[in-house]
Amino acid sequence: MPSARLQQQFIRLWQCCEGKSQETTLNELAALLSCSRRHMRTLLNTMQDRGWLTWEAEVGRGKRSRLTFLYTGLALQQQRAEDLLEQDRIDQLVQLVGDKATVRQMLVSHLGRSFRQGRHILRVLYYRPLRNLLPGSALRRSETHIARQIFSSLTRINEENGELEADIAHHWQQISPLHWRFFLRPGVHFHHGRELEMDDVIFSLKRINTLPLYSHIADIVSPTPWTLDIHLTQPDRWLPLLLGQVPAMILPREWETLSNFASHPIGTGPYAVIRNSTNQLKIQAFDDFFGYRALIDEVNVWVLPEIADEPAGGLMLKGPQGEEKEIESRLEEGCYYLLFDSRTHRGANQQVRDWVSYVLSPTNLVYFAEEQYQQLWFPAYGLLPRWHHARIIKSEKPAGLESLTLTFYQDHSEHRVIAGIMQQILASHQVTLEIKEISYDQWHEGEIESDIWLNSANFTLPLDFSLFAHLCEVPLLQHCIPIDWQADAARWRNGEMNLANWCQQLVASKAMVPLIHHWLIIQGQRSMRGLRMNTLGWFDFKSAWFAPPDP
């Protein structure tokens, strides 16, 4: 019998006997474990061989045998739990232990670095599963980061300085304002072993032609081997950066036939997905990666929803308590903001916008927040921390305003906290705030109407590219803000847009109302090198490394 199964049977026997040694019979024990008399004898003999108990059998009718426990079920359960934890079998650990507080304590004690059989393993604790990693779909902040570890694209953007770098394409040139040429590396392999072909690249880029930022791509052809020509309907100075974004990452052209591709995707990036469940995401360094192989061999993201309620929740990276810590922090490039929905009569009403933005000002929200949140929140007066576009002007409550609807996407604890503060403030002005939570996909598509939306945005480097790109690619914003998005996109592509002025106009009209900038924090270990937090609150796994243990 496998050791794990035997351990489970012993724990069950110990629990049924309440851990007490006793006189009993083989039939009684077999009934407790719902097995045959013969199988029960085999179990007892095997458990005795393991040193967990003694079984002194008595022969004869009416005779009772002696069962003595030498090992407690709790001790064996702890040992079993440690084994499961070491094997990263979190699903089974949760089932075995049951108690969430105990599971959390065990997980936290095993965070950070592990060195096993010559392999460096990094364990990270996160507050929610990362089940959808499909490029081109609606991806949240953390899924966007993970996708960048799994997939490659024609180009990539350096997370630290925002500079454009080569990826699958080693060089590129602009032939004319409407014609770009990219030269691709041969010998690139997917995680499932197949070599990347030009058809994969062409297929991947054509599949995103329906997205607003890629809709100007007229044709994609390969005139010679490992050469890719992209023809546009309008000039785009940002095209090389656009092709380094997550939607433009390269998939195997047969991806739709591969099982559970969204949660177990196959790319050509530095890490391959090994496991992705509701309790754990495990990715492993790809030995055949065409670039420098990652120095951390394996990254395990353990999921514990309970940490979502902690203000500094999100990403937890801590080693043993006695180890020195290194804290990496930055003020996010982006903010929480209110979005007024022009499709509703209250969302389109300028008086309502003026008054709501006045009573729900950033300083009011921070003032009414608990101290633990005040330490992490910074009042926002622009979409970026350096901008001061919002002006707080006293405004009178519109006559007849009795209720408002606020909507945000679920699985985000700070949304609930901020919404609760808003509800409290508005109630003091005799306005009822109806709060709705919807899925991230529903939020992204924006088909549902709401007077106001509570959103958040994290912009990546370079900001003059990503700010407009991020806002333009969210359908909800295009539904709520009635401006000529296509004309603005054309000006942006031509380099004719003053981005600061454009954002200031959105803030001045109260279409968007900045609320809070959030401090992003990673607490790691001093033995970890190369940890540089990016604007998404994570770090590039392939660039981090651990100094090896002393010989």
From Swiss-Prot:
Record's keyword annotation contains Transcription regulation: yes
Keyword set, alphabetical order: Activator, DNA-binding, Repressor, Transcription, Transcription regulation
DNA-binding region: 26-49
Record domain HTH marR-type: where: 1-116
Domain of life (superkingdom): Bacteria
Molecular-function annotations in GO: DNA binding; peptide transmembrane transporter activity
Ranges where the record places region Solute-binding: 163-492
Biological process terms in GO annotation: negative regulation of DNA-templated transcription; peptide transport; positive regulation of DNA-templated transcription
Matches recorded under NCBIfam families: PRK13626.1
Physiological role: Activates the small RNA gene sgrS under glucose-phosphate stress conditions as well as yfdZ. Represses its own transcription under both stress and non-stress conditions. Might act as a sensor of the intracellular accumulation of phosphoglucose by binding these molecules in its C-terminal solute-binding domain.
Protein name listed in UniProt: HTH-type transcriptional regulator SgrR
Organism: Escherichia coli O6:K15:H31 (strain 536 / UPEC)
